[in-house]
Amino acid sequence: MFEVSAIVFAVSQAAEEGKSSNFLLPNGTFFFVLAIFLVVLGVIGTFVVPPILKVLQERDAMVAKTDADSKMSAAQFAAAQADYEAAMKEARVQSSFLRDNARVDGRKSIEEARVRAEQHVVSTLQIAGEQIKRERDAVELDLRAKAGAMSLILASRILGVDITASVVTR
């Protein structure tokens, strides 16, 4: 029952206070709480917000700088890529030119070697022909010189008479 009497006492006291106060007119507690709020707001605005804003501004500046560096790096990369592509294109053209020149030089070298080989063959054949002609002429002279004597020996063998002495005396 103690609980019920405490509740009744609290309700009656609240009713008495409610009759004397007007909710449209603020009382002293409101002004005290408002003053504390304004002091806390001033302290936070003076000591907490400026360092946070400074850090945020520095962060924004770093982000902007990083973005600018990124754009500059992308532009440099694109320029380097273009230079690389141009250099590669030029190198391909130059290598193609050098390869074609090497092929032409190789064909010229092969043709020159073929001409030299043909000249060597012709000169070798000419030298061999001249040598064979000289040997043939020498053999022919030798055979002509010996042909008379051989025919006499052959005739004397066939006839059985020595013809060598009579031909030589004539």
Curated annotation (Swiss-Prot):
InterPro entries: ATP_synth_B-like_membr_sf (IPR028987), ATP_synth_b/b'su_bac/chlpt (IPR002146), ATP_synthase_B_chain (IPR050059). It is a single-pass membrane protein. GO terms for cellular component: plasma membrane; proton-transporting ATP synthase complex. It is found in: Cell membrane. One of its GO terms (molecular function) is proton-transporting ATPase activity, rotational mechanism. Keywords: ATP synthesis, Cell membrane, CF(0), Hydrogen ion transport, Ion transport, Membrane, Transmembrane, Transmembrane helix, Transport. The keyword Transport applies. Pfam families: ATP-synt_B. The chain crosses the membrane at residues 30-50. Belongs to the ATPase B chain family. F(1)F(0) ATP synthase produces ATP from ADP in the presence of a proton or sodium gradient. F-type ATPases consist of two structural domains, F(1) containing the extramembraneous catalytic core and F(0) containing the membrane proton channel, linked together by a central stalk and a peripheral stalk. During catalysis, ATP synthesis in the catalytic domain of F(1) is coupled via a rotary mechanism of the central stalk subunits to proton translocation. Component of the F(0) channel, it forms part of the peripheral stalk, linking F(1) to F(0). F-type ATPases have 2 components, F(1) - the catalytic core - and F(0) - the membrane proton channel. F(1) has five subunits: alpha(3), beta(3), gamma(1), delta(1), epsilon(1). F(0) has three main subunits: a(1), b(2) and c(10-14). The alpha and beta chains form an alternating ring which encloses part of the gamma chain. F(1) is attached to F(0) by a central stalk formed by the gamma and epsilon chains, while a peripheral stalk is formed by the delta and b chains. This is ATP synthase subunit b. It comes from Mycobacterium leprae (strain TN). The lineage of its organism: Bacteria, Bacillati, Actinomycetota, Actinomycetes, Mycobacteriales.
